[in-house]
Regions:
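Active-site cores of enzymes that catalyze phosphoryl transfer or operate on phosphate-rich substrates
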Residues: 2
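Conserved alpha/beta catalytic core and glycan-binding cleft of carbohydrate-active enzymes
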Residues: 63, 84-167
Length: 167
């Protein structure tokens, strides 16, 4: 995944350029929008380059024809659009989509992140529908909310919307 790394302080990225590759919150601590202890600062030029270049490599060398971005909402819109542009140069039919949310608060303005509410700004990039998922089985965080598969009412409109593809 591109939204976080296993280590932060002692990661190769942080050892190479301290405090550059990871976002920090207003207290100077590493931000945790990934829910895994850190989040990459995709809006920074060298982080963006690393992500875009690796997608180009995977697509060119291994003929990968689609990419799914875990917690895409941690990434900035510009980086995601640059990924799409780079992918289009290789194969315009390449499929790119991701989860339009984060796992926590990000240390970057929400209006600049690739979250579900901002998908109109993501050109040629889809977002997974957690609304449809939650309507079918219920949200991760609340077992009492509506879910068709559990026989709990309350999400019928979300299901209808999801079934027709949000048209």
């Amino acid at each position: 995944v591109y939204n976080h790394t296993a280590a932060t302080d002692n990661s190769n990225l942080n050892l190479a350029v301290p405090n550059y590759y990871y976002r920090q919150n207003s207290q100077g601590c590493f931000s945790n929008g990934s829910g895994c202890g850190n989040e990459l600062a995709s809006e920074r030029s060298m982080v963006r380059k690393m992500i875009v270049d690796s997608v180009i490599f995977w697509a060119s060398e291994y003929h990968i024809d689609g990419f799914r971005f875990d917690l895409m909402g941690v990434h900035d819109i510009e980086t995601m659009n640059q990924i799409r542009a780079a992918a289009d140069e290789i194969d315009p039919s390449m499929y790119i989509y991701g989860e339009g949310w984060s796992a926590g608060s990000c240390a970057y303005p929400t209006e600049k992140l690739a979250v579900k509410a901002n998908t109109p700004q993501l050109h040629g990039i889809g977002a997974f529908s957690d609304d449809m998922r939650d309507a079918l089985r219920g949200p991760f965080s609340d077992d009492t909310k509506g879910a068709l598969l559990a026989g709990i009412p309350g999400e019928e409109e979300s299901l209808k919307f999801g079934i027709v593809g949000g048209i």
